């Protein structure tokens, strides 16, 4: 029993964030590395940091070490550069006025560099290919439950609707709609740079998946509340997805105020439901 408890504790520890001491050591190392060696050293440091490998970090720090004041100045400069590029936290790439956050955005950067003729090798193999290909057929004895949490003010939600519809139509699933209140209506503070990035990133995703944003009219406030108030009855009638999809199209493509009574009445009527 004690052995299993120790194993669980080790698993929890292995999955936790690195300690502040190791983060400080990693920052010290990377602050002392020149641009030419940065990628190689950063790869070693990152791997050791997330393994909690203090021995490896100590070894690297014998060759690369910056004082506390040097690290502070380096981070200050880096944050200023990041802010100037319109971003709000780390782990993002920036190239020629376009930001790429996370591994699933690197294919965009690779495509762009390839189009510019920057690829060093002639092979066509993609380095950052996502390889996200759904099976042509999905055989299942029972339907799979898909829970969808749309937000009426989310550009990402809008972009996702086309693929959610395709999944619903082409695979054996039960689609359960779980609308959520927009972040701004939950008193969450969204930095300006974050809001700008979300909009530009979602627009990029929309172009990629052929569901582009065009004229935007934010539904924040009363329009969202009024629209959501009708949802339970419409969802009960089996038209919940179509209703949310139409609201998002109105907000992110057609520039329509979805709180307008005439719009809502027409929408409900078009869904072949009784407005009264």
Language-model regions: role of each:
Residues 2-8, 12:
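Single conserved hydrophobic/aromatic residue that forms the stacking wall/gate
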Residues 17-18, 64, 147-153, 217-221, ...:
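Conserved strand-turn element in the central/C-terminal portion of the radical SAM core barrel
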Residues 29, 226-230:
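Conserved N-terminal beta-strand and adjoining loop/helix that marks the start
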Residues 31-32, 191-196, 232-233:
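Short, hinge-like loop/turn segments at secondary-structure boundaries
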Residues 32-35, 40, 44-137, 142-147, ...:
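C-terminal cap of thioredoxin/glutaredoxin-like
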Residues 174-187:
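Thiol-based oxidoreductase modules, predominantly thioredoxin-like and allied folds used
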């Amino acid at each position: 029993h004690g052995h299993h408890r120790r194993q669980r504790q080790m698993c929890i520890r292995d999955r936790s964030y690195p300690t502040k001491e190791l983060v400080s050591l990693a920052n010290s190392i990377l602050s002392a590395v020149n641009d030419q060696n940065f990628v190689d050293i950063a790869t070693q440091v990152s791997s050791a940091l997330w393994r909690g490998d203090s021995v490896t970090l100590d070894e690297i720090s014998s060759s690369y070490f910056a004082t506390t004041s040097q690290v502070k100045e380096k981070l200050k400069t880096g944050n200023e550069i990041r802010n100037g590029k319109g971003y709000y936290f780390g782990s993002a790439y920036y190239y020629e006025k376009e930001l790429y956050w996370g591994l699933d955005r690197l294919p965009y950067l690779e495509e762009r560099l390839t189009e510019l003729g920057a690829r060093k090798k002639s092979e066509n193999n993609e380095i950052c290919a996502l390889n996200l290909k759904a099976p042509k057929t999905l055989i299942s004895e029972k339907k799979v439950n898909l829970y969808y949490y749309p937000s009426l003010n989310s550009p990402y939600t809008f972009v996702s609707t086309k693929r959610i519809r395709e999944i619903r139509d082409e695979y054996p699933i039960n689609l359960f709609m779980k609308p959520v209140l927009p972040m701004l209506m939950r008193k969450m503070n969204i930095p300006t740079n974050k809001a700008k990035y979300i909009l530009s990133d979602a627009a990029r995703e929309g172009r990629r998946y052929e569901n582009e944003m065009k004229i935007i009219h934010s539904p924040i406030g009363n329009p969202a509340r009024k629209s959501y108030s009708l949802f339970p009855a419409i969802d009960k009638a089996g038209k919940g997805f179509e209703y949310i999809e139409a609201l998002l199209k109105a907000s992110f493509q057609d520039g329509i105020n979805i709180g307008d009574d005439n719009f809502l009445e027409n929408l409900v009527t078009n869904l072949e439901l009784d407005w009264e």
